[in-house]
Amino acid sequence: MTYLAFVRKERRLLTFAISFTFFSSFGQTFLLSLFVPYFLVSFELTNTSFGTLYSLATLSGALALPYLGQWIDRIPLRVYSMYVATGLLIATILMSISWHVVMLFFALIFLRLAGQGLSSHTAQATMARVYDRDRGKALSISALGYPIGEAILPSIIAFSLVYLHWRTTWGLIAALISFVFIPILWSLIKNERTKVVQDEDEEVASTRENYTAIFKDPRTFYTIPAILIPPFWVTGLFLYQVSAAGDMGWTAGIVASAFIAFAAARIAAGLFSGPLIDRFSAQKLFPLLLVPMMLGLAVAIFFTGHWTAYLYMGLVGMTLGLSSTLKSSLWAEIYGTKMIGTVQSLFASIMVFSTALSPFLMGWMLDGGFTLTHIFVIALATSLFSALLSCRLFFRF
């Protein structure tokens, strides 16, 4: 089935998934970073203290994600999705009325959990378990919400912060979720009868049994490093992009404009990979996941000039585009669709833990005298090791 025919046939559920990936932006680092200067002033925080607060909030959300994520396998999708959307609404309201650092901390926990965690999880788990033959297409289309959010929301938020208080801006975000996001979701999903994939005479395995099955499968350990490498290094490198601009000879304007290449490559890779997954399977394509990122790191290490920023960012964006489509398809192929929610929430939690640790490690290396080139070399080496390990899905060596 072509993309156009698939979209026409499944437009309601695809729009549902894209809405979740788009609105997950309000819990993503790229958007929250726009408010950091205002948080520092309003709550009298230092960069170090806010970084610690943010990492603790991220880790707290990661601890809750496996438990809350598994419920998508157990209750109707329309009910689960409303819980997640309501959680995101509560998080934005809490942020808009945060007058103490403790309130800020809890607002960050809920934003990271309901936004980055559960919103992304809901979209990807739904696509992975509802579709079989067209799973790759479904996941690649649903992932379009990420780059769309990255492309348009920062400018809108930055414009708002020029004229409005940051708390007012969060109040407007809460209104957007309440009067746009939730009604759209309900109109799309109110008649949905998607059920847990389970035979009538089969009991749902306990979460502990599911986890045991996951970690007994050797393929789990062949794939985890390659899954974690892109978000780990991208989180740290993007957080210190100002340092990257100086060390690599790139201006701040060049780095900002290079994000266009990043978003475009991410969209293209995600859409291109969907039909390939449907044709060849995610397991066969997975060993290629880190190749674009490794090429981008090699360009940044061995070449100089403004053009390297665009090529580096584009190639990294390509890996993230592939990753957003490949991961959920891979889980469905390896572990089946019956416990896809449990599997995906577990790995999402592990990923969030890794992204919480990345800023600490990156800051420690930069303070210890490492240059961005040194860090790129380490990132390339770890990416190469992870890529070779993932090849064991098909080759024995």
Q: What feature does the model see in each segment?
A:
Residues 13-37, 43-47, 65-68, 237-242, ...:
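Extracytoplasmic
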Residues 63-101:
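Conserved MFS/SLC helix-loop-helix module at the cytosolic interface between two early adjacent transmembrane helices
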Residues 109-144, 336:
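Cytoplasmic helix-loop-helix junction between adjacent transmembrane helices
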Residues 142, 146-192:
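Helix-loop-helix hairpin linking two adjacent transmembrane segments in secondary transporters
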Residues 277-330:
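C-terminal transmembrane helical hairpin of 12-TM major facilitator-type secondary transporters
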